[in-house]
Every structure is written in structure tokens, then in C-alpha cells.
Amino acid sequence: TKTKTFIYKEPSTEDLIKKKDIENDKTKSGINKSISLAEEIKKDIDELNKAILEKKKIGWEEKEKTKNILKKQKELEKQIKNTQKKNSENLKNKEKLNSSILEKQKKLEELMNKVFDEEMKKLLKEMEEMMDKADKEKLKDLLEKLDKENTDLEKELDRELE
């Protein structure tokens, strides 16, 4: 029986930038909501102060406005904490992402060093020399060696993808 082949696609730099931009936009949106709510609270406080100055006694209406301001203040606090939490998570994800990218880069570098080892470089140099000399049999032999090296390389890359 044959198993299904699954393809894992590493997100491209462009995808990562888009994701980061979306996260930044969400953070900015959260901050903007908090700013709007803070301005609304300030306006309500100013109105309440004005109402209190005009009246000798604090009535039911002023108490309701005070409750409303306190409610909005708690909502603002909740929004700010939520935005901070999301921002903190974004930073953690970026750190993980960066370490993941660094790890991938390191693996790729090791693979490239393995692939383009001295033997491969020697084969390529010999091939260049054979092109100048036009030695058909020697060139054929070098092409076979190069093909074998490339087959090994392909297998190594497949293993890296798994």
C-alpha cells in the first residue's frame, strides 16, 4: 500500500510580514478603541462635574452618570489589559518565529555545506576542464558522478522536508 503524501509549506517572508501587519493592525485597533473610550469617559466626567456644580444636591441622575462612568472605566481597563495581553503574545510569537527561522537557516546552511562539499566542487572543476578538452568518455564519467551526487542531494532535501 502507498501512503498519502502531504506537503508542508513553510510560510514565506511575505506571508509572515502580512501576518505581522494584521497583528499590528489589531493592536492598533485595540489601542484606538481604548483611546475613544477614554475620551468618552473624559467627556462624561466633564458633564458630571458641570451638573454637580449647577446643583446643590447630588440626585439620582448624577448617581447613574457616576455608575456609568465607573462601568466605562472598568471596560477601559479590561480593553487595555486585553490589548497588552495580545501584544505580549505577539512578541512571544515573533521570538518563536525568529528562533524557528534561525534554526531553519542553520539547517539550510549545514545542508548547503554538505551538498557543496569539496568532492562536488572538484567534480564541477573537472567538468569545466573536460569541456575545454572535449574528452567524451571522461565527460560521460563525470556526468554520471554528478548525477549520483544530485540524486543523493535530492534524497537529502526530501529528508529535510519530512
Identify the meaning behind each predicted range.
Residues T1-E162:
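Feature detects intrinsically disordered, low-complexity acidic/polar segments
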